[in-house]
């Protein structure tokens, strides 16, 4: 049967003729050397060019990554080799290497060596640790040397292909070839080594339109691959798959089975002649260089072919070799950290007659099925003996050990535990995939149909594009994974049984209530498995998550692509494998899963009984789960982390609990948060205590001013000055009526202009003193501006109502420290919004507008005649004492509503 490998195009980039291509081992980069003289680096994930080096005006026929140095080395037709740093784009080295066109450069995998071959018929070895000195020259070819490549299994040797129709194998340190392979009828263009360990092969491609596979130990031709219609310009053994790739000037790339040498596939992307093939060990990506651009394809899936049984025994395949490891061999004394690679001893179990594309234990772990090449073979897990085989595109197990195979899109066969065919099903649709488990599932690209194993009857059809299917061991839950999300459904087997046993009809949609949708999660699953009622999976973002009751929890962030193997309950660990067959484990407590499951079911008594068996270090995780379910009280009781408990207590309004945590933690942020909460809930004593602990002076200012607490403001003044919080100290002085202290604070803060303006408004008697200071300070910077400042003692005419302001200040000053009770706020709020100076002037105007007396004289004239007109000072005194309120509650500026003149004339101060 042929290999069935999906081939997907991952990059198609048009450019000048690509003479060589290379893949970066860690970055998603393709290196392409162009006939136009430039070297480009393409990002195949973003489909964009990320770097470009203008090497020369002549063709660049070969370039390679030197990743351990972050370099690109390129050989061109101008006979120079150039080295660039691909991060900084700097040119590291340029030197003339040959006397004719450079055809190929090859980088040694471990040593600081680069080989170059040329049309001058020479091969040269360069050592970059010695300043790119030529340390050896290899002579022997009689025509152009088209390609050189190191032997990956013996890096001290390399092979060269030449147009003299030969391939020569050389050793470093020896100027003469070890041997020569001669078999092509025309020039040899390319050569590559087989990377696997079982065959000492190399392959060559020639202008005679053939590729030949050679055994370099017996020096004989093993196979000739014929089929191309033009020169074979590029060949390679794929490092991960049992295939050979050959590229030709006929525009095609042919894929051959590396064991049977059967032609498996032919690719033609319409970009004219093929010039180069690039690949990388550990990857299934292949890059093809054409006349008109570059193509990258991905052959097959990179999921490792591996399976683990319930006891921890893992079996995997590397090509046709079957190997096994056992997690139990790691003793309990070896403490392996989560995510650390397990030191497993690999044992050879045997070989497989077909190339495995899937491998799976049956439910009890006794048998293992290998499926690939359109066939399946069932082996015993311990001795690796063949028990059964047959044709199958896919193979799936049932939960009780039966199995089904998909022979084609129109035929599915069910077999018993004794490997006997029991039933054949011909679905009325094209079955593209099948899945096993409690029910046998067949799906197309649009829907999935579930059938029972016993009779093959359809149970239910669900319209969804299914990528994978995972059944819980209980058989009651199933996960359907699609491209963008996954669905968790409950299987109502009792409903199905009663419907079928009662003779109910099954329509095109099946039994209506067979499945019940429980949850839909918008995440793309890479691999998954069930542990009880908990679904464990890793997603496309490389996170290891588990889902209980629709609630997703991230266990760990993975540093690379991993694939789930299974869960060992006795170790409480879930195991994963990467594509290099490294196995890692992560702790996932079964008791934690059971607890969450019980909570989701509402069985709180059993959940609480299980709680003591969960380690203390996991209690915060439990608490967060309870919080997500809205069970904050229970979460607070279980949580151990003080920060988390504090947050929960604040959410619940449990201020005493939060206060106890804050006392223990002595965190300013916690005290501040608690103080704000206490203030908002009316617990002002606690708010004051918390704000004092937090040294939140702004909060204390708000609290004391709201309470009218003069004593508190006095204490706050001292605290603010000690901490340099001058704004807070100023406001405290102002509200306490200590205007002189306000001025002094402004002066000490070097805010002399502000002090002058304040004194003009509130303490006019201090203006001359402040102006003198202001002049002295300003003299240092701008003498002319300093001279322009006017002193009211010298120029009273420049200061409106100056004498009245002085009189008002003198009368109000004794009453500044007396505070009106808050109950009188309404009286003061109803007063006109005017200053005392304005009030005095308005009073005079009012007196002048009084109606005339009986004699026809107005009051003002009568007063003048009687000589009893009050002085301005007396008038101010009368205004202050006669307005119906008490003790200086009228401010100097008369703004009774805002109380701006007395530094603590807040009506609310008690």
Curated annotation (Swiss-Prot):
Q: By its UniProt entry, which InterPro entries does this protein fall under?
A: Beta-prop_COPA/B_2nd, Coatomer_complex_subunit, COPB2, G-protein_beta_WD-40_rep, Haem_d1_sf, TPR_COPA_B, WD40/YVTN_repeat-like_dom_sf, WD40_repeat_dom_sf
**Function of this protein?**
The coatomer is a cytosolic protein complex that binds to dilysine motifs and reversibly associates with Golgi non-clathrin-coated vesicles, which further mediate biosynthetic protein transport from the ER, via the Golgi up to the trans Golgi network. Coatomer complex is required for budding from Golgi membranes, and is essential for the retrograde Golgi-to-ER transport of dilysine-tagged proteins.
Where composition is biased (Acidic residues), the residues are: 865-884
SMART domains in the cross-refs: WD40
Q: Name one Pfam family in it.
A: WD40
* MF (Gene Ontology): structural molecule activity
For this UniProt record, give its keywords in alphabetical order, as a comma-separated list: Cytoplasm, Cytoplasmic vesicle, ER-Golgi transport, Golgi apparatus, Membrane, Protein transport, Repeat, Transport, WD repeat
Which branch of life, at top level?
A: Eukaryota
Show me the WD repeat boundaries. Answer: 13-52, 55-94, 97-136, 140-180, 183-224, 227-266, 269-309, 351-393, 461-501
Q: Where is this region: Disordered?
A: 865-910
Q: Show the ranges annotated as biased composition (Polar residues).
A: 886-910
**What subcellular locations does the record give?**
Cytoplasm; Golgi apparatus membrane; Cytoplasmic vesicle, COPI-coated vesicle membrane
Quote the subunit structure annotation.
Answer: Oligomeric complex that consists of at least the alpha, beta, beta', gamma, delta, epsilon and zeta subunits.
List GO terms (cellular component aspect): COPI vesicle coat; Golgi membrane
Its membrane topology: Peripheral membrane protein
Q: Major location, coarse class?
A: cytoplasm
Family, according to the entry, reads as follows: Belongs to the WD repeat COPB2 family.
Q: Which organism is it from?
A: Oryza sativa subsp. japonica (Rice)
Q: GO annotations under biological process?
A: endoplasmic reticulum to Golgi vesicle-mediated transport; intra-Golgi vesicle-mediated transport; intracellular protein transport; retrograde vesicle-mediated transport, Golgi to endoplasmic reticulum
Put simply, this protein is called Putative coatomer subunit beta'-3
